[in-house]
């Protein structure tokens, strides 16, 4: 029994949800998203709530039950409020700036790193040491933030690099004399 899967997903106000077989479509003020559920689960729209049930009691069906429910909840929240991920840059000379739609990062390399913003994602740089990635697709926002962080992840000795705003870097002690 999936604890997450058995909870019905409430459709928020201002969002219209449509279930067509295995395809769940959500349309809201921020845009439109869809999710195609696996054949192991059944999806129904009842009284402004989306109910996900496993087709049978196989282990595979139970595993996809909770995941499908969470994905549907994510698209409903995304089209209403959207998602954002904040990144911080630490280090002398490390900074970020926007050049048109591209993000330019100075991260201590011999060249600046230019990251092209994908479709459906908005990147903002309120301060040279702060990056805000936002969009309606939770997976895509997280992936873009992870790709930016990957250019120069935080190192444990001085804490230099790109890190998530809520991330805590465990610092190591330097070598002793």
Swiss-Prot record:
Subunit text: Part of the 50S ribosomal subunit.
Gene that encodes it: rplF
InterPro entries: Ribosomal_uL6-like, Ribosomal_uL6-like_a/b-dom_sf, Ribosomal_uL6_a/b-dom, Ribosomal_uL6_bac-type, Ribosomal_uL6_CS
Organism: Sinorhizobium medicae (strain WSM419)
Job description of the protein: This protein binds to the 23S rRNA, and is important in its secondary structure. It is located near the subunit interface in the base of the L7/L12 stalk, and near the tRNA binding site of the peptidyltransferase center.
Keywords (A to Z) from UniProt: Ribonucleoprotein, Ribosomal protein, RNA-binding, rRNA-binding
Coiled coil regions in record: none
BP terms from Gene Ontology: cytoplasmic translation
Protein name: Large ribosomal subunit protein uL6
MF terms (GO), sorted A to Z: rRNA binding; structural constituent of ribosome
